[in-house]
């Protein structure tokens, strides 16, 4: 009795210019020939079917025949793209039941643990857009309450198995990942060319900024094209031994992208979800050696050594299970790395380090060298303990810069002009003293409100870092924006609260990479 | 820095014929003058503001100027209605942050208990449509995991306080509620006229069917108008001492309606949420004496005496706290009550009982009398133990029927024709034996697939009940439908699995009302 009602006439597909993000949306007329719209309300779910092809969508109802007539069903942009059938095709539209895997989610809500088969079914339905927003939220929140280690392993395995699975013809495929939160922390763009110049394979995919003023992909985009598909990425890696591309077109762990799109608005952030997200992507990417950077600081994502330890163990446990050698380093996350925050400014810092320019940010150089050193030690041919010296040699000799240029050429020319925002003003110290702290969250927010990362030239250029002595009225940093109203807002906010703590203590020294 | 960006030009409101149900939806152009749509994705949240009036909405983006131009913002039907500003009004549109109360939801997800103030803030935001679907799901699921008794009391109080709060000029205001799940269980339409005929006040609001083939409001609608607003309802109660109206226009506990709209698609159903839903509505309705009917049976909502006990204690606890005298009766929920299932058939049964017609269903009559007896005992002037006799007297004498007629006249004429579906066929016994069980879930589904409650004349008319002897080929029930394809589907499903268990045991006897 739950079979589709095939005796009703099919509707013809029409495309509606509505970008509804992740959610599939279908529109029918209140006088539809194929459905009794009285039984529907807005945001019910319907099933569209052509032969064996099925799409689940959230329903909206219109009274406007110009939008959708009684014989039509309208598909929003993402639904139209995913269903991939031409306008005018005949499609059956029936009420949809929830995906069967939702029973497991309900059990999880009640406190049961899930089997690997149940988790695999959930991830499969997620990745194929069969869950509504609410249903995704239901899964995430039930899992946020508790996730057993067995559940976590099943989740990582299932997430890595849907979507692209890359394999490489060498046993040592290195990768690095930073859990984020630190402005200006663009070490990846220095580490990748060093490691590739040495001869280890490092096929790096990165994200665009989600809540920060720049991601590696946003910054790299100023130097080269980053929206490569899988085949194009493989060509670059085979030619250069490494790449710096955006993960968006490579489709590694698509379920993760979907989960993140709900975690973000709900600000859900549990260790297990972080580990599942990162490890599923690395597993799908074919990485075998992974270095993870945990910045620790009062305004970083990880605020204490205990928290870092727990998270490290979780990464190691999952890595061991899947045959990925995971190494976690805790780094100084008390302040931004480098000087620039925002894509253009960060690209400037990266190229200054790679080019051994005078005035290149020493902390960005030093951190990148230390991370690269860890990765180079994965090379069995390198004598133990010489990774740092080798990294420094590759950077100082210009080999890393040359490799970066090769990667840029292979990926293709950047589509973006690398211009700084035309509005700029300095934010000044309110008193004499020593910089004792820089609030990373605050600096991130200021750079975002100035327009970064959408406005590539917007952001913040730091003149002072922790330990620097400042005089009242001396500039702390410069705010850049490309848009007048964003500039006014960001500057006013920075002047109200700069994010700098200035007093007369001398800050404690912290080792950069543990 | 999170202040609205007032330096951007406002947009003008346009109305879009899209019924998006509970969710507020706003549409802007990808080339919008007031927003940088690049920073948005579909299903981001935006804040619309005119002076101090604010609406939160989920955003969709269009490339079609004919739908929404760069100077416009489109509001879906519910958003337009709720914002209540004319087409063409200038409105500022800015990115919306989540409601502040969502921090408490996040704490709850992490396992914290919430204060009364936090719960009140959540309910206030819910009732004012400030939560997205996902956010509502987040709250429900965090609460489904555990809800303390203090949290439950705070929830009931907060839910009852938003929306209409009815007060009556008498200390004894009786009410009844059935937790549902039993087909044909239309006792309310018999109990209300008996109790009102006696002289106790019983201002009854009922729901339409959500997952069953008929609600009291759907059935009553065949006899009288039910979509009364608060003032009209009060007039009926003052004139008749009781009413039988749909709760939808009375706006008791609007937060409950919103929670239910998410609980339903997720099939969330915890004791605490059931208690919060029912008790908040009764408190808002001004009820002081409440009788709750728990049908217990293998396919009922409550399947065991232990479960019934736990739920009863929870209702009593909340009732005591808010000064509502709650009495719970467990009733026989092993099979449907009466013969008809579906609005027209159920209205027929109700009127047969009220009219003392020969052949009126004895079980529906008996159960209604027993429930009415419990309610009549709330009258201090009635001698203890005489409630049943008094109820029977009011029914047998025709006083209850007369009262029903008075209520019908006061509420106004029914807008619906009371015609049975024109397609009908009998479902036959597959073997000789005795009816040992009737699956309530199955019967509900069959009646729904036949078209009930939307098709008022669709449903099932039972010829056999538990304990009846049947011969192979004898009709068990008749399926009615108004639509050919629904008829075919329902009949095929019924023939595949009738919902009747027939064997050679004699079923155990169960007392009707405990």
UniProtKB/Swiss-Prot annotation, chains A, B:
It comes from Rhodopseudomonas palustris (strain TIE-1). HAMAP family: Thymid_phosp_2 (MF_00703). GO terms for biological process: pyrimidine nucleobase metabolic process; pyrimidine nucleoside metabolic process. It catalyses: thymidine + phosphate = 2-deoxy-alpha-D-ribose 1-phosphate + thymine. It comes from the Bacteria. GO terms for molecular function: 1,4-alpha-oligoglucan phosphorylase activity; thymidine phosphorylase activity. InterPro entries: Glycosyl_Trfase_fam3, Glycosyl_Trfase_fam3_N_dom, Glycosyl_Trfase_fam3_N_dom_sf, Nuc_phospho_transferase, PYNP-like_C_sf, PYNP_C, Pyrmidine_PPase_CS, Thym_Pase_Put. The keyword Zinc-finger does not apply. Keywords: Glycosyltransferase, Transferase. SUPFAM superfamilies: Nucleoside phosphorylase/phosphoribosyltransferase catalytic domain, Nucleoside phosphorylase/phosphoribosyltransferase N-terminal domain, Pyrimidine nucleoside phosphorylase C-terminal domain. The keyword Transport does not apply. Pfam families: Glycos_trans_3N, Glycos_transf_3, PYNP_C. PANTHER family: THYMIDINE PHOSPHORYLASE. It is an enzyme of class 2 (transferase). Belongs to the thymidine/pyrimidine-nucleoside phosphorylase family. Type 2 subfamily. GO terms for cellular component: cytosol. Its EC number is 2.4.2.4. This is Putative thymidine phosphorylase.
């Amino acid at each position: 009795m739950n079979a589709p009602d095939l005796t009703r006439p099919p509707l013809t597909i029409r495309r509606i210019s509505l970008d509804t993000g992740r959610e599939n949306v279908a529109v029918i007329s209140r006088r539809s020939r194929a459905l009794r719209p009285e039984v529907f309300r807005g945001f019910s779910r319907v099933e569209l079917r052509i032969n064996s092809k099925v799409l689940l969508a959230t329903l909206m109802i219109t009274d406007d025949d110009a939008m959708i007539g009684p014989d039509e069903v309208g598909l929003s942009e993402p639904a139209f793209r995913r269903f991939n059938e031409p306008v005018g095709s005949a499609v059956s539209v029936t009420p949809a039941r929830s995906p069967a895997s939702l029973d497991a989610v309900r059990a999880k809500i009640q406190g049961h643990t899930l089997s690997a088969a149940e988790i695999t079914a959930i991830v499969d339905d997620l990745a194929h857009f069969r869950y509504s927003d609410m249903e995704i939220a239901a899964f995430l929140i039930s899992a946020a309450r508790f996730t057993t280690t067995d559940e976590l392993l099943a989740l990582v395995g299932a997430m890595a198995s849907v979507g692209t699975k890359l394999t490489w013809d060498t046993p040592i495929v290195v990768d690095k990942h930073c859990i984020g939160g630190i402005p200006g922390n663009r070490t990846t763009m220095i580490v990748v060319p060093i490691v590739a110049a040495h001869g280890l394979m490092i096929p790096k995919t990165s994200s665009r900024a989600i809540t920060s003023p720049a991601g590696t992909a946003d910054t790299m985009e100023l130097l080269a094209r980053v929206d490569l598909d899988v085949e194009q990425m493989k060509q670059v890696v085979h030619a250069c031994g490494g790449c710096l591309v955006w993960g968006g077109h490579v489709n590694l762990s698509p379920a993760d992208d979907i989960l993140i799109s709900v975690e973000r608005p709900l600000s859900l952030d549990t260790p297990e979800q972080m580990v599942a997200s990162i490890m599923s992507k690395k597993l799908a990417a074919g990485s075998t050696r992974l270095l993870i950077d945990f910045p620790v600081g009062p305004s970083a994502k990880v605020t204490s050594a205990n928290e870092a330890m727990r998270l490290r163990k979780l990464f190691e446990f999952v890595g061991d299970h899947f045959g990925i050698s995971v190494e976690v380093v805790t780094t100084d996350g008390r302040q931004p790395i480098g000087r620039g925050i925002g894509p253009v400014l960060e690209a400037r810092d990266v190229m200054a380090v790679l080019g051994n320019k005078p005035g290149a940010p020493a902390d960005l150089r030093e951190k990148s060298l230390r991370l690269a050193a860890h990765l180079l030690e994965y090379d069995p041919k390198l004598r133990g303990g010489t990774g740092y010296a080798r990294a420094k040699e590759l950077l100082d000799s210009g080999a890393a810069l040359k490799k970066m240029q090769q990667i840029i050429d292979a990926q293709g020319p950047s589509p973006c002009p690398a211009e700084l925002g035309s509005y700029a003003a300095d934010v000044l110290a309110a008193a004499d003293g020593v910089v004792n702290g820089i609030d990373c969250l605050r600096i991130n927010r200021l750079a975002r409100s100035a327009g970064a990362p959408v406005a590539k030239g917007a952001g913040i250029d730091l003149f002072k870092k922790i330990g620097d002595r400042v005089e009242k009225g001396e500039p702390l940093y410069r705010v850049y924006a490309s848009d007048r109203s964003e500039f006014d807002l960001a500057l006013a906010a920075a002047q109200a609260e700069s994010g700098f703590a200035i007093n007369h203590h001398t800050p404690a020294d912290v080792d950069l990479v543990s």
